């Protein structure tokens, strides 16, 4: 593995604070630690100055004016130097283990501009033991030393053996040496390259993300591909010259194109019209014959259509008559179905209402009972309330009376009187005149017992009354049922009538049960009756179609006869079909054969024309395809011999051209590289020194120098040695001769001259013998003589080459003609004449058409008979299964009988349906009708008498009770006793009054509550009665409506009615369908007859017009044929292949040619007048005159000295051969020069892919780089969308834009720019020229967009910008970008330097304290992995674990400022090692 070059040390001489200081640089990281002003930036500035000694770039910002609006004159360098000579040197060792010291001598220039003078130099071959400070300083004594100026340094080094000192006048040479020796990574050819390198170093020095670099990453990372641009420029220049030549050839071809165009268009114009007239004459004859045939056929068709029209009209009238009857039957059936459906719906409603009425009846009876009970309770409540009211009133009156009695003191007397009155009333009621107050209690018990007895008797009578009332209601119910069923009758007749109704109900139920079987039987018989009627209709229709009446017994025999006739007709029809198919097949085969022959005929005619042309061109007659192929092989052999000779002549011509070009080089150099090497070495070509040698001396000097005649004469060979190292771009043998080019002679050789030869003694043991060359080339005179002879030879070769090219071109055209003939016409050229075969096939086709017409007429009659027989068999097939129905005469009577029985059963069913419920209710209670409960009135009277007796007993008992209660009143005899009892009675009356009022209140409340309940019961009752009456009324209405409908509503009635309606609808639909068919057919027949009539008239008119036209055109055609034959142009005008084109195509062809001819002869007055006269369509012979005039005009313009032929067509062919040869030669040259757009796209795309892969490899080295929150750094390389679209179009869709790249007015760069503008119209191109834009588009770098991204914390990947990162993160990210750029430069420059060189890698970092320990460790790891050296500057607190650390402290001692430096290498277990190279205190190290 090649070791990477390293910077060993940095030496500062006479810098501010550093007199002679050498810093040994660590292989990885060198840290400069110190406070502000310690000299860290000065040390780094010295390094940068030695690396890039360009004063236009150097600018150390941290020491210039902060905030200045203009740049400092010092730019930071002048103030870092001391007066006198200063040095900054870099000691390096490269991959070849060569020690190289490069550096600069700096010196302040006096003046206010504060300028600095810089001189770069390099030292090679310096021993390792010599330190850089020893070279540039001279020790005066122990305490003093002197800095050597540059000239003394040069003398000192020249005195040292093996040491080379080089001073450079240009920075380019200085950097070129550094690149070649592996000190810098990139060859810096220009100021732009140096600026990029300085920006890189500056960015690394000050840290962070440099916007100057990130904005132009493409320039830093992507190499320029200038070779592609140069190749395109050369290509465009050659193409421009070639196109100019081709344009000149096209101008020359214009005359040839005009002649060819005139002949071609004139031939098309006249031949198309000539053949159109010939075709029209033949077509008119064919049309006349066709019109005559069609006229005869149309007359026959019209007669057949007339017969057909009469038959269909008769059948249509029959169907129209039958349709009215079917419509009436169908309407009646539909109405009947609607009535049945209505009756069924009415019946369903009746049944539903009857069920509702029964339910309402039950609810009504229940509600009547509830209302009766409520009324009784209401009466009791009213009586109780009335009694309570009376008692309250009585007590109040008693209390009022008592109060009054108190006032008059007569109360006792009143009570006594009342007691006496009560006793008298009891006596009166009880009829006890002896009743006293004392015996009243005994009589009270007697009358209470009597009251109890009367009450018991009344209750017994009440029970009997209830039972009698029930019997009376049952009798009334049964009587009402009988009245509802039978009508009004006497009550004594109810029993007999009820029994009769029950017996009749049983019979009616029995009949009603027979409704369904009778209905099914009737439906079956009606179906059979309808089938019988249909069979009778079919039989009548069949007899009508056959034109004869047939008996039922004759139908089977007739059926067999018709089947036999169908079989025979089917065989004949089948045979006729096969015969017709055979005829049609033969006709189709003939037609297909004729069509194929007509399609082949133009091809065969074209093949014959091509074959005749070939025979004329080669003078051979070809009778078979073998003759053609044999002649083609001979032609190929001749062509191959001519091509070989032409290529030999061409190769010799090219060799002569190359030799002329080589000899025409200035100075006689045959290799351009020699001129570049001579300029590089500072020498002169030997051929230039002897350029003036005479032609006679040229052979001697050429033999004298031999192979070294192309040597380079240099003043000093030792100075050329360094240029020869790694020199690859040179001839295999490069001769160098030391000498003065101004006074060079041939004394460098020891030579003996012989006869036409010399012997050169190169060394004591090496001689060279060289003869004089026959054609000397040494010297300008010899070269010019050789060039003259070569030019003469080139003229001969060019003439011979042109002759051979013409012959080859002619042979190739003949070969192409044969190839085209073989590829297109050989397969048909030697076949039989298709037109003769077409004529034979046409005659056979006419015979087939005549036979087919006769066969069609015969077959039509058989087909009609066959169809009639098939219709008869079809009708019989429908009639024969119904013969038994036709023979059944009693079917209608049986239907009537069953219908009558069904009517009786349906009447019984209606009776049962109407009165079934009443009979069912009457049957369990019919027995109550046997006796009429007339004693019910007597029982009612007894009950009323019992009630009166009970009331009388109650009154008597009450009167006795009152006497008993007033028994005390009888003792009131005086008023004193009466007054003494006033107080007690008053209180008792008041208590009874309160109790009576409370009782009255309760009675009123009970009366009101029960009254509300009674009202609700009455409302429910009224609602039920209303609903019952409404439904009863609706039921009666529905029954009346059902009776009014007059239709039997049973379960099968609807189905029967629907079947009947559907049958009639099917018959009506069939009749209408047949009628519509007949109407359409009749309309079509009438239209066909009208069309045939019009067609007959038109055919008659067309036939007579065509006959007249044929006769009229015959005279004009004869005149045209005479003119064609007289002028001998029939061969060119009678193009038989045009006979197969239509008239429109020929007319279009002629019109197009006419338009082209008007333009072609616009400048020729004679041809223009003849052409205008030929446009008359009524005078076709004038077109022939125009064609003859064109041929005569072209014959007069053929140059017989160049083209010896009288035929203009042949002359054009010869001219075309020569011009085609020249065009092909130049076109092939242009194709060699041109490059396709797809190739351009591929080159650019491959370059982009290569660079993307390279960037991807660079990204891999930065995957694990992390600074702070930045976890990784990467570089994104994307193709711009607009440019990607351009590449896609160039590679995939370039055919759509060939108008740009095939344009002769645009170069490739301009076409590319135009395409870019076409694809991106939104982009403003400004004032830039398309050529400039196109050249930019040829640079692949303009297609790419590059940006740096960092993976930072939770933000993920984002664009690397200083504002989005911390200071340390920005420094680390910027360092990663710079490392990537350096690595990219190395990869880019690897092919430019030696393979055994691996350049040095070194970057800077000032103010590294902004990085944390982890970031510092990452930098160390990055340096170790990439073998990169890093110089960082940091304050006191930086203490790296690896590398070398220098502690800088600036001190002032005796008015002298110097920097105290202490260095230590890493952290080792032992004590820090003092580094060598310190020239101050013993503890200091450098």
UniProtKB/Swiss-Prot annotation:
GO MF term list: ATP binding; DNA binding
Domain of life assignment: Bacteria
Protein name listed in UniProt: Chromosome partition protein MukB
Coiled coil location: 326-418, 444-480, 509-603, 835-923, 977-1115, 1209-1266
Annotated segments matching region Flexible hinge: 666-783
Keyword Kinase annotated: no
Subcellular location: Cytoplasm, Nucleoid
GO CC entries: cytoplasm; nucleoid
HAMAP family documented for this protein: MukB (MF_01800)
Keyword field: ATP-binding, Cell cycle, Cell division, Chromosome partition, Coiled coil, Cytoplasm, DNA condensation, DNA-binding, Nucleotide-binding
Complex and partners: Homodimerization via its hinge domain. Binds to DNA via its C-terminal region. Interacts, and probably forms a ternary complex, with MukE and MukF via its C-terminal region. The complex formation is stimulated by calcium or magnesium. Interacts with tubulin-related protein FtsZ.
Domain notes: The hinge domain, which separates the large intramolecular coiled coil regions, allows the homodimerization, forming a V-shaped homodimer.
Physiological role: Plays a central role in chromosome condensation, segregation and cell cycle progression. Functions as a homodimer, which is essential for chromosome partition. Involved in negative DNA supercoiling in vivo, and by this means organize and compact chromosomes. May achieve or facilitate chromosome segregation by condensation DNA from both sides of a centrally located replisome during cell division.
Family listed: Belongs to the SMC family. MukB subfamily.
UniProt binding sites for ATP: 34-41
GO BP term (any one): DNA replication
């Amino acid at each position: 593995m090649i070791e990477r070059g390293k910077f060993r040390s940095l030496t500062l001489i006479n810098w501010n604070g550093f007199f002679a200081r050498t810093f040994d640089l660590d292989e990885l990281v060198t840290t400069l630690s110190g406070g502000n002003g310690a000299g860290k930036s000065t040390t780094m500035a010295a390094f940068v100055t030695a690396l890039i000694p360009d004063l236009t770039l150097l600018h150390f910002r941290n020491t210039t004016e902060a905030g200045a609006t203009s740049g400092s004159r010092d730019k930071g360098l002048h103030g870092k130097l001391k007066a006198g000579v200063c040095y900054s040197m870099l000691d390096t060792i490269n991959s070849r283990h060569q020690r190289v010291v490069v550096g600069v001598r700096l010196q302040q220039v006096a003046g206010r501009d504060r300028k600095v003078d810089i001189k770069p130099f390099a030292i090679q071959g310096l021993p390792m033991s010599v330190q850089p400070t020893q070279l540039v300083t001279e020790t005066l004594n122990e305490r003093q030393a002197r800095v050597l100026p540059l000239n003394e340094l040069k003398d000192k080094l020249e005195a040292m053996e093996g040491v080379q000192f080089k001073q450079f006048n240009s920075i380019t040479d200085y950097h070129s040496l550094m690149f070649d020796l592996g000190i810098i990574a990139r060859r810096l050819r220009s100021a732009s390259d140096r600026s990029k390198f300085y920006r890189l170093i500056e960015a690394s020095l000050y840290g962070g993300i440099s916007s100057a670099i990130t904005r132009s990453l493409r320039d830093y990372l992507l190499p320029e591909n200038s070779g592609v641009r140069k190749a395109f420029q050369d290509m465009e220049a050659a193409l421009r010259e070639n196109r100019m030549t081709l344009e000149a050839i096209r101008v020359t071809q214009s005359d040839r194109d005009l002649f060819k165009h005139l002949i071609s268009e004139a031939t098309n114009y006249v031949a198309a019209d000539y053949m159109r007239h010939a075709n029209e004459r033949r077509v008119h004859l064919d049309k006349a014959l066709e019109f005559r045939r069609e006229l005869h056929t149309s007359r026959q068709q019209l007669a057949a259509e007339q017969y057909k029209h009469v038959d269909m009209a008769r059948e249509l009238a029959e169907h129209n008559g039958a349709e009215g009857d079917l419509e009436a039957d169908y309407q009646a059936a539909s109405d009947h179905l609607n009535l049945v459906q209505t009756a069924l719906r009415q019946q369903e409603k009746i049944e539903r209402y009857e069920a509702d009425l029964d339910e309402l009846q039950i609810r009504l009876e229940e509600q009547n009972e509830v209302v009766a009970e409520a009324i009784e309770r209401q009466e009791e409540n009213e009586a109780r309330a009335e009694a309570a009211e009376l008692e309250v009133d009585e007590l109040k009156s008693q209390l009022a009376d008592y109060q009054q009695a108190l006032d008059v003191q007569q109360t006792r007397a009143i009570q006594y009187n009342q007691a006496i009155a009560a006793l008298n009333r009891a006596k009166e009621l009880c009829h006890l005149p002896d009743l006293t107050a004392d015996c009243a209690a005994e009589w009270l018990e007697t009358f209470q017992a009597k009251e109890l007895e009367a009450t018991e008797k009344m209750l017994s009578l009440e029970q009997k009354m209830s039972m009698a009332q029930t019997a009376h209601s049952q009798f009334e119910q049964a009587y009402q049922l009988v009245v509802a069923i039978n009508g009004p009758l006497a009550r004594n007749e109810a029993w007999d009538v009820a029994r009769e109704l029950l017996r009749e109900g049983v019979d009616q139920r029995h009949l009603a049960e027979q409704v369904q079987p009778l209905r099914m039987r009737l439906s079956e018989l009606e179906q059979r009756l309808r089938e019988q009627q249909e069979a009778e209709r079919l039989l009548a229709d069949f007899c009508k179609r056959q034109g004869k009446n047939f008996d039922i017994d004759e139908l089977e025999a007739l059926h067999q006869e018709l089947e036999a006739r169908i079989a025979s007709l089917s065989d004949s029809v089948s045979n006729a079909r096969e015969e017709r198919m055979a005829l049609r097949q033969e006709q189709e085969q003939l037609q297909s054969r004729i069509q194929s022959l007509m399609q082949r005929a133009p091809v065969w005619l074209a093949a014959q024309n091509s074959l005749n042309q070939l025979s004329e061109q080669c003078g051979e007659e070809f009778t078979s395809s073998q003759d053609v192929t044999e002649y083609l092989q001979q032609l190929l052999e001749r062509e191959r011999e001519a091509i070989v000779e032409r290529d030999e002549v061409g190769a010799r011509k090219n060799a002569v051209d190359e030799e002329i070009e080589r000899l025409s080089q200035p100075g006689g150099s045959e290799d351009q590289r020699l001129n570049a090497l001579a300029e590089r070495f500072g020498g002169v070509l030997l051929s230039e020194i002897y350029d003036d040698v005479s032609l006679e001396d040229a052979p001697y000097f050429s033999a004298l120098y031999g192979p070294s005649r192309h040597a380079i004469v240099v003043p000093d060979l030792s100075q050329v040695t360094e240029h020869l190292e790694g020199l690859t771009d040179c001839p295999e043998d490069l001769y160098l001769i030391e000498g003065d080019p101004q006074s060079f002679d041939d004394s460098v050789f020891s030579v003996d001259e012989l006869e036409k030869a010399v012997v050169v003694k190169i060394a004591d043991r090496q001689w060279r013998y060289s003869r004089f060359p026959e054609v000397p080339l040494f010297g300008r005179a010899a070269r010019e003589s050789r060039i003259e002879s070569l030019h003469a030879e080139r003229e001969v070769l060019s003439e011979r080459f042109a002759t051979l090219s013409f012959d080859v071109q002619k042979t190739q055209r003949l070969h192409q003609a044969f190839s085209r003939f073989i590829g297109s016409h050989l397969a048909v050229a030697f076949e039989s004449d298709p037109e003769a075969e077409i004529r034979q096939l046409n005659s056979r086709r006419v015979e087939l058409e005549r036979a087919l017409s006769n066969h069609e007429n015969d077959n039509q009659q058989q087909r009609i008979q066959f169809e009639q027989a098939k219709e008869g068999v079809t009708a019989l097939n429908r009639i024969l299964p119904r013969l038994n129905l036709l023979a059944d005469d009693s079917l209608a009577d049986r239907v009537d009988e069953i219908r009558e029985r069904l009517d009786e059963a349906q009447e019984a069913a209606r009776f049962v349906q109407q009165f079934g419920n009443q009979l069912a209710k009457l049957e369990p209670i019919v027995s109550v009708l046997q006796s009429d409960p007339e004693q019910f009135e007597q029982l009612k009277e007894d009950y009323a008498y019992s009630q009166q007796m009970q009331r009388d007993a109650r009154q008597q008992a009450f009167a006795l009770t009152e006497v008993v209660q007033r028994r005390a009143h009888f003792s009131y005899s005086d008023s004193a006793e009466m007054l003494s009892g006033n107080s007690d009675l008053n209180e008792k009356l008041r208590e009874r009054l309160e109790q009576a009022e409370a009782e009255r209140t309760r009675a009123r409340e009970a009366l009101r509550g029960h009254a509300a309940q009674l009202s609700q019961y009455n409302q429910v009752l009224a609602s039920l009665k209303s609903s019952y009456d409404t439904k009863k009324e609706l039921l009666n209405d529905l029954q009346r409506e059902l009776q009014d409908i007059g239709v039997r509503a049973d379960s099968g009635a609807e189905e029967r009615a629907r079947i009947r309606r559907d049958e009639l609808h099917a018959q009506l639909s069939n009749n209408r369908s047949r009628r519509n068919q007949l109407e359409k057919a009749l309309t079509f027949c009438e239209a066909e007859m009208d069309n045939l009539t019009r067609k007959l008239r038109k055919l008659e008119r067309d036939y007579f017009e065509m006959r007249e036209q044929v006769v009229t055109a015959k005279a004009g055609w004869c005149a045209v044929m005479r003119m064609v034959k007289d002028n001998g142009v029939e061969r060119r005008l009678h193009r038989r292949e045009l006979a197969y084109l239509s008239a429109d195509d020929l007319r279009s062809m002629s019109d197009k040619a006419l338009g082209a001819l008007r333009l072609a002869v616009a400048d020729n007055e004679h041809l223009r007048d003849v052409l205008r006269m030929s446009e008359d369509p009524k005078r076709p012979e004038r077109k022939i005159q125009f064609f003859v005039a064109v041929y005569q005009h072209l014959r007069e313009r053929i140059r017989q000295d160049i083209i010896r032929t009288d035929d203009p067509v042949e002359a054009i062919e010869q001219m075309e051969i020569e011009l085609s040869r020249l065009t092909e030669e130049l076109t092939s040259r242009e194709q060699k020069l041109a490059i396709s757009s797809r190739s351009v796209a591929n080159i650019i795309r491959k370059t982009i892919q290569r660079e993307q892969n390279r960037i991807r490899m660079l990204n891999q080295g930065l995957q694990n780089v992390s600074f702070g929150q930045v976890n990784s750094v990467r570089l994104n390389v994307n193709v711009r969308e607009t440019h990607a679209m351009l590449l896609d179009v160039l590679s995939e869709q370039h055919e759509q834009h060939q108008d740009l790249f095939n344009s002769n007015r645009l170069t490739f760069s301009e076409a590319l720019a135009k395409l870019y503008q076409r694809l991106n119209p939104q982009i403003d191109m400004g004032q830039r020229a398309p050529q400039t834009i196109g050249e930019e588009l040829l640079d692949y770098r303009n297609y790419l967009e590059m940006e740096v991204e960092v993976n930072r914390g939770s933000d993920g990947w984002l664009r690397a910008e200083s504002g989005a990162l911390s200071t340390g993160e920005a420094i680390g990210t910027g360092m990663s970008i710079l490392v990537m750029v350096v690595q990219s430069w190395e990869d880019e420059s690897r092919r430019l330097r030696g393979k055994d060189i691996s350049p040095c890698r070194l970057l800077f970092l000032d103010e590294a304290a902004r990085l944390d320990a982890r970031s510092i460790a990452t930098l160390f790891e990055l340096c170790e992995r990439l073998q990169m050296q890093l110089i960082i500057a940091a304050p006191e607190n930086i203490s790296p674990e690896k590398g070398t650390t220098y502690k800088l402290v600036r001190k002032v001692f005796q008015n002298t400022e110097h920097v105290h430096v202490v260095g230590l290498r890493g952290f080792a277990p032992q004590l820090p090692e003092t580094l060598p190279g310190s020239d101050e205190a013993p503890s200091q190290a450098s």
